[in-house]
């Protein structure tokens, strides 16, 4: 059974140490999704963000963090209830892990601006290699008015994962692109993902985008104003910084 982990790794072309690290992260993410599925997590929550786009829609860059949203607000929700399922899933594949809660006071300005007080953040790390870890975030009081769909994942076994639809994934990315700012910098991965959505002709769910802006930023924005903000953000983007940010996560 524990060769399944290595079999999952073998699906990735690994030339450099960075290639191997990225592959390990993604295998860990898939195993974590499997554990959450077995625990019934997706009856209450949905997967979104860059890692969701990578795993289920073949975005050609690796992604580090796992972002989840409850389907409805629930301040009593505890991700800890699903830890046994995640730990057991790794154990079945011959890997011991530890799950630790992160102290949000240590996050930088960009991270903390996009983490509300009711967002829980945890690290999943190997028992023997704690530097190899993935971050899990669950928003228990999320912006709503989004749609979800069931997506099939084949590894480590075949199971369904509840995910945001592409228009709502796009809305989350556009919110990050325009409002996640730090000294006028745009996170390179946001730019890279934005280009993917445009190239693939994905429609934007503006209703959900407006809901995210209300929830995180406390303002009302119509389409005309949002386009103005987007153009301003793109005009101030440092392309060299964008490339530096995204290069470790892509092959070319």
Question: What is each residue range found by the language model?
Answer:
Residues 48-51:
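Glycine-rich beta-strand-to-loop/alpha-helix junction loops that act as flexible
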Residues 54-63:
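Short glycine-biased active-site loop of nucleotidyltransferases that positions the nucleotide triphosphate
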Residues 1-30, 35-45, 56, 71-252:
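Structured mid-to-C-terminal alpha-helical surface segments
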